[in-house]
Amino acid sequence: MQSSFKTVPFTPDFYSQSSYFFRGDSCLEEFHQPVNGFHHEEAIDLSPNVTIASANLHYTTFDTVMDCGGGGGGGLRERLEGGEEECLDTGQLVYQKGTRLVGGGVGEVNSSWCDSVSAMADNSQHTDTSTDIDTDDKTQLNGGHQGMLLATNCSDQSNVKSSDQRTLRRLAQNREAARKSRLRKKAYVQQLENSRIRLAQLEEELKRARQQGSLVERGVSADHTHLAAGNGVFSFELEYTRWKEEHQRMINDLRSGVNSQLGDNDLRVLVDAVMSHYDEIFRLKGIGTKVDVFHMLSGMWKTPAERFFMWLGGFRSSELLKILGNHVDPLTDQQLIGICNLQQSSQQAEDALSQGMEALQQSLLETLSSASMGPNSSANVADYMGHMAMAMGKLGTLENFLRQADLLRQQTLQQLHRILTTRQAARAFLVIHDYISRLRALSSLWLARPRD
Amino acid sequence: MQYKTETRGSLSYNNNSKVMNNMNVFPSETLAKIESMAAENAVVIFSVSTCCMCHAIKRLFRGMGVSPAVHELDLLPYGVEIHRALLRLLGCSSGGATSPGALPVVFIGGKMVGAMERVMASHINGSLVPLLKDAGALWL
């Protein structure tokens, strides 16, 4: 994210520089195309010829050229310095500059770790040449400049002298610039080296994690339920992703149906389809709960902002009704009463289940702490095992709570569907979907926020 | 609405014919005991004192302003028999082990409504409150 923000503004700058370079010389325009990036040599080799062939008039033009060239070099330096702060960025940046990949560059380089690293390796070459050329160019430019001066004002000794001094000063400046450039290069190479080591570490970690994973899997392969739990969680996530895509498609249909003033009967078909699709996710969650209740309770299959609002493995029905608010008006008095009652009863049911969960935690705590703890904890193994079995039994209730919570959600949606007209229900589904989309977008933004 | 009629129907079925035919499975005194216990109050909950879902349903009724009569089966002398009979009434032939949601069981106006999910579903679809009003458990 950051790199794309950074690189975009540089590109026009780069272009403007090269167009400066050839300003006022239309005959050089054709060279504009083949000259890539900072490979100035070709241009420089040609420039003196052009200048000598032309009159003094070009002197000033060339001065600008030089300054701009210098400025451009400075620009490059700034970019390099900016880039050195994050070596991934540099890689992408230099890649862009070196090969003039403007649009797709970032995306391509970003596509995977390996890609970007190989790009970085390639680009280190680019950087080397471009910085070197940068300093060489200046010398060449100076040479050309000087020769040109001599050609135009060869009789004036003082002029030559002052030009010598200027040349010396510029040479000194060049040396200084070259030294700085070498230091930067060193730092950059060091940075690359660091990232290479970091990558190697990450790869090592990944390998170890994979090995552990396979060990765990092999270790419990005798215990089928465990393996099934792992597979079950995985397959739930798969199913959920599939469900989300299907839901999105249905919502799109519904939206276009509402916008195009579709007839009530046709709209009802779409609304009923969304409703029964909701039933499908509750069915899937039911299976997931049986497989791994803690996974469903954790909500790891949802985005962070969705998780923030999560209650017993899903949304709060009463909250959903609050979201709908005045988005589905106008409601008749009867509908209004129905919605109010629904909100109240879902709130009461939620409170009851929450209190049941609290009781569950409390009794689990008591069960686990009532077994003898402390110094003579190993004294009574049977006592310990008995309490553990009891605690296991209590944890089994968790599944029931999750199932009840999902039933509550499902019933609330169904009741909402019954209270509202088809058109209102369609709008309600769209509002709910938009709200969840916003939560997901918020999560993405939050995860991508710059962190210092 | 559909839940209410369904449960009432199944209960009456159990009471009238099935029970008569299976005297050995349903000792008549246990059923009679359940019936009399269920008639004690407008709302009666058969519960287990350590059950957290039972705790939740008690809180649900109290949250609605109803004060139910609660029978903690683990503290009653014939609790186990009553529990078994209730599971039969609910249609859980496999027993309590495979369906932990069986208890609590709720009776309103002497008639069985069902376990937690039935009670919650009828609350959400708006049929529970009229039922409670009819039974005299709720005034407003």
From Swiss-Prot, chain A:
<dbReference type="InterPro" id="IPR025422">
    <property type="entry name" value="TGA_domain"/>
</dbReference>
<feature type="domain" description="DOG1">
    <location>
        <begin position="233"/>
        <end position="449"/>
    </location>
</feature>
<dbReference type="GO" id="GO:0003700">
    <property type="term" value="F:DNA-binding transcription factor activity"/>
</dbReference>
<comment type="similarity">
    <text>Belongs to the bZIP family.</text>
</comment>
<dbReference type="Pfam" id="PF14144">
    <property type="entry name" value="DOG1"/>
</dbReference>
<keyword id="KW-0238">DNA-binding</keyword>
<dbReference type="Pfam" id="PF00170">
    <property type="entry name" value="bZIP_1"/>
</dbReference>
<feature type="region of interest" description="Basic motif">
    <location>
        <begin position="166"/>
        <end position="186"/>
    </location>
</feature>
<dbReference type="GO" id="GO:0000976">
    <property type="term" value="F:transcription cis-regulatory region binding"/>
</dbReference>
<keyword id="KW-0010">Activator</keyword>
<keyword id="KW-0175">Coiled coil</keyword>
<comment type="subunit">
    <text>Interacts with GRXC7/ROXY1. Interacts with BOP1 and BOP2.</text>
</comment>
<comment type="function">
    <text>Transcriptional activator involved in the determination of floral organ number. Acts to determine floral organ patterning by establishing floral organ primordia in specific numbers and positions. Plays a role in regulating stem cell fate by directly controlling AG expression. Binds to the 5'-AAGAAT-3' cis-acting element found in AG promoter. Might represent a target for a post-translational modification by GRXC7/ROXY1.</text>
</comment>
<protein>
    <recommendedName>
        <fullName>Transcription factor PERIANTHIA</fullName>
    </recommendedName>
</protein>
<keyword id="KW-0804">Transcription</keyword>
<dbReference type="InterPro" id="IPR046347">
    <property type="entry name" value="bZIP_sf"/>
</dbReference>
<dbReference type="InterPro" id="IPR004827">
    <property type="entry name" value="bZIP"/>
</dbReference>
<keyword id="KW-0539">Nucleus</keyword>
<dbReference type="GO" id="GO:0005634">
    <property type="term" value="C:nucleus"/>
</dbReference>
<dbReference type="GO" id="GO:0006351">
    <property type="term" value="P:DNA-templated transcription"/>
</dbReference>
<dbReference type="GO" id="GO:0000987">
    <property type="term" value="F:cis-regulatory region sequence-specific DNA binding"/>
</dbReference>
<dbReference type="GO" id="GO:0009909">
    <property type="term" value="P:regulation of flower development"/>
</dbReference>
Curated annotation (Swiss-Prot), chain B:
<keyword id="KW-0249">Electron transport</keyword>
<dbReference type="GO" id="GO:0045892">
    <property type="term" value="P:negative regulation of DNA-templated transcription"/>
</dbReference>
<dbReference type="GO" id="GO:0000122">
    <property type="term" value="P:negative regulation of transcription by RNA polymerase II"/>
</dbReference>
<protein>
    <recommendedName>
        <fullName>Glutaredoxin-C8</fullName>
    </recommendedName>
</protein>
<feature type="domain" description="Glutaredoxin">
    <location>
        <begin position="31"/>
        <end position="139"/>
    </location>
</feature>
<keyword id="KW-0963">Cytoplasm</keyword>
<keyword id="KW-0539">Nucleus</keyword>
<comment type="similarity">
    <text>Belongs to the glutaredoxin family. CC-type subfamily.</text>
</comment>
<comment type="function">
    <text>Has a glutathione-disulfide oxidoreductase activity in the presence of NADPH and glutathione reductase. Reduces low molecular weight disulfides and proteins. Involved in flower development.</text>
</comment>
<dbReference type="InterPro" id="IPR011905">
    <property type="entry name" value="GlrX-like_pln_2"/>
</dbReference>
<comment type="subunit">
    <text>Interacts with TGA9 and TGA10 in the nucleus.</text>
</comment>
<dbReference type="Pfam" id="PF00462">
    <property type="entry name" value="Glutaredoxin"/>
</dbReference>
<dbReference type="GO" id="GO:0005737">
    <property type="term" value="C:cytoplasm"/>
</dbReference>
<dbReference type="GO" id="GO:0005634">
    <property type="term" value="C:nucleus"/>
</dbReference>
<dbReference type="InterPro" id="IPR036249">
    <property type="entry name" value="Thioredoxin-like_sf"/>
</dbReference>
<feature type="short sequence motif" description="Responsive for interaction with TGA factors">
    <location>
        <begin position="137"/>
        <end position="140"/>
    </location>
</feature>
<keyword id="KW-0813">Transport</keyword>
<dbReference type="InterPro" id="IPR002109">
    <property type="entry name" value="Glutaredoxin"/>
</dbReference>
<keyword id="KW-1015">Disulfide bond</keyword>
<keyword id="KW-0676">Redox-active center</keyword>
<feature type="disulfide bond" description="Redox-active">
    <location>
        <begin position="51"/>
        <end position="54"/>
    </location>
</feature>
